[in-house]
């Protein structure tokens, strides 16, 4: 069985994290040549490339598996060392999360863990349809995803659902929908998406109003919080989690444009198996809080 030297795995990890050999060398406090030699040693051991030499470099499928192995080893080392870690650098936990979870329930869920445990969070924001890929590539140790099936050597639990409402301000609704929300009126009403791959509003409008993708004017804004601001100021109509705008809906600052119609996104928590002691704390915190505030039906 091939047993890689974890120094060489750390070199591979550094090249990916630092997006190049030069910065990886600086991070590891070794020469760039030494980084190249360590990766070449790994590639010779496995008889195949582990990096695609693009700019920035990216791992091959085998490279992804090795990075995933490194993440598991780092977490298990923390558990094995236990109290001997006291006073050392806090453990780094890299998690892939969707922006709407980050803007609503995730940070309150993690508050007890952050208060009681010496950890550093590296929260990587990605669409919930793509977070699991970061776990597959070994970039993170846990992911909030809409995928219900676990990856090999991983665990998965249901967190609950976010219900997205199609909302706007009252002045916006009066301007664009004086006769109600209709297919023809929607063609002129600007919406907003998180990025070019965010298709939630397109799916909602196609399903309920038979509007094909790309038929309505759309802003691109990479911020969940900005969605709320844009809607409040009367700039757009948009899909926002009910959990994020409960106060605005109660006060009438925002209105549900299509009562009874919504998009539901069921979320799942994925992580490597076996779990370290610290990851078990994170899992318990996320599941406990998620089951309280997210839809469970």
Swiss-Prot record:
State what inhibits or activates this protein: Specifically cleaved by the protease DegP. Cleaved ArgP can no longer interact with the oriC region in vitro. Cleavage may play an important role in the control of the protein availability.
GO MF annotations, alphabetized: bent DNA binding; DNA-binding transcription factor activity; sequence-specific DNA binding
- Where is the secretion signal located? none
Annotated HTH lysR-type domain ranges read 4-60
> Transcription regulation among the record's keywords?
yes
Null mutant phenotype reads: Null mutants are more sensitive to canavanine.
Look up the record and give one Gene Ontology term from the biological process aspect: regulation of DNA-templated transcription
Q: Which CDD domains match?
A: PBP2_IciA_ArgP
Q: Which residues bind DNA?
A: 21-40
Which InterPro entries does this UniProt record tie to the protein?
ArgP, ArgP_gammaproteobact, LTTR, LysR_subst-bd, Tscrpt_reg_HTH_LysR, WH-like_DNA-bd_sf, WH_DNA-bd_sf
Supply the SUPFAM superfamilies for this chain: Periplasmic binding protein-like II, Winged helix' DNA-binding domain
What family is this? Belongs to the LysR transcriptional regulatory family.
Q: What does this protein do?
A: Controls the transcription of genes involved in arginine and lysine metabolism. Activates transcription of several genes, including argO, lysP, lysC, asd, dapB, dapD, lysA, gdhA and argK. Acts by binding directly to their promoter or control region. ArgP dimer by itself is able to bind the argO promoter-operator region to form a binary complex, but the formation of a ternary complex with RNA polymerase is greatly stimulated only in presence of a coeffector. Both arginine and lysine are coeffectors at the argO promoter, but only arginine is competent to activate transcription.
Q: Give the protein's recorded name.
A: HTH-type transcriptional regulator ArgP
Gene behind this protein:
argP
